[in-house]
Amino acid sequence: MGYLHIDGRGMKPNGGSRHNPLEAETIAAWLVAHKDDIERHYGEPLYKVVGVVTPFSAQVNAIKMSLRKLEINGKDEQGLLTVGTVHSLQGAERAIVLFSPVYSKHEDGRFLDSNSTILNVAVSRAKDSFLVFGDMDLIEMQPAFSPRGLLAKYLFSSDNNALQFEFQKRQDLISAHTQISTLHGVEQHDEFLNKTLAGAQKKITIISPWLSWQKVEQTGFLASMALARSRGIDITVVTDKNCNIAHVDDDKRQEKQHLLNDAVEKLNKMGIATKLVNRVHSKIVIEDEELLCVGSFNWFSATREDKYQRYDTSLVYRGEGVKNEIKAIYGSLDQRQL
C-alpha cells in the first residue's frame, strides 16, 4: 500500500456529485510521470496495469478529463485506462489501483464509512499496489474501527508508504488578485520562511509534522523567530507528537520524547506557542490571513546535507482568496490537538 497526501478540496455542486479537482489533476500528472516506468516493469501498456477508482461519478469525469488534457488516455492509446466508480472494477483486477477518496478536511466524509464494501472492493481489486491519492489528514482522524480507520492503520504502518510528487496548483484558490509562486529545494524554502518571519505583520503559523531543534537552529529559523517575537509577532508551531517519538525500541522512544519535550519547552520560553496534534500530514506556513504555503517540505526536520536532500516543492498563494482555506486548516487542527 501507499499514499500521496494531497491538500485539495472536495466540492459538491447543488444537487450534483462530489469531485476534487486537485486529486484528479494530480493522479493524471502522476500517471504521466510514471507511465514509462510502469510499462517497463510490467511489460504491458498502462491501461492493462492500472485502474483508477473513486466513489463518485463526477470525480470519474474529472479524472478522465485530466487524463485527456495530458494526452494519456486519448485516441492514440491502444486501449482506455479504466477509470470508474468502485463497483466498475467488480470482477476485474489490476496490478495497480489508484483510489481517489474526494473528501477533504473541509467536510467529514462519513459516506466512505457508511458502506464497508466501498473500500473493501477497491482494495481487493489491486493485485500488487493499492495507492490512495487524497487528504491523509482526514483519513487519519477516523476511529480505528471504521473502514477509513482500518485503511489508515495499513497506509501509515511505514514511512516508506508515503509517495513523493510535485504539488499541483489549487485552481479554486487562484483569482485575478492571487499571486502564486513555487518553491523548489531546501535553499528556496529556507529563504522563504526566514523572509516571511521578517515580514509578518501580526501572526504566523508553521505546520511541520517533525520537529528537530538542531534543524531549527541550523537554518536560521530560531534567530528569525526570535526577531519576529521581539516585534510582537504571534508565532505558532504545530507538530505531530507520534511522528516525533515513534520507535519500536522503548528506550529510543523515551529518548525521542525527551528531545521533543526539550524543544517544546525552549520554544515556549521564547513566547512561541507550540501545539502537539495527532497525525498531521500537511506541511504548511500561514502568515496573517493572506499568505498560504502548502507543499511537501518538512520545515523543521528536512536534512540540509546535499547528498541526503530531497527535492521538495511548495506552492505559495498570496491574496484574500486564501482566507476561507486558512480557516478550514485551523478548524482541522483544532479537532486533532492533544
Curated annotation (Swiss-Prot):
<dbReference type="InterPro" id="IPR025202">
    <property type="entry name" value="PLD-like_dom"/>
</dbReference>
<dbReference type="Pfam" id="PF13087">
    <property type="entry name" value="AAA_12"/>
</dbReference>
<dbReference type="Pfam" id="PF13091">
    <property type="entry name" value="PLDc_2"/>
</dbReference>
<dbReference type="InterPro" id="IPR027417">
    <property type="entry name" value="P-loop_NTPase"/>
</dbReference>
<keyword id="KW-0378">Hydrolase</keyword>
<dbReference type="GO" id="GO:0016787">
    <property type="term" value="F:hydrolase activity"/>
</dbReference>
<dbReference type="GO" id="GO:0006793">
    <property type="term" value="P:phosphorus metabolic process"/>
</dbReference>
<dbReference type="InterPro" id="IPR001736">
    <property type="entry name" value="PLipase_D/transphosphatidylase"/>
</dbReference>
<dbReference type="InterPro" id="IPR041679">
    <property type="entry name" value="DNA2/NAM7-like_C"/>
</dbReference>
<dbReference type="InterPro" id="IPR047187">
    <property type="entry name" value="SF1_C_Upf1"/>
</dbReference>
<dbReference type="InterPro" id="IPR045055">
    <property type="entry name" value="DNA2/NAM7-like"/>
</dbReference>
<protein>
    <recommendedName>
        <fullName>Putative uncharacterized protein YjhR</fullName>
    </recommendedName>
</protein>
<feature type="domain" description="PLD phosphodiesterase">
    <location>
        <begin position="276"/>
        <end position="303"/>
    </location>
</feature>
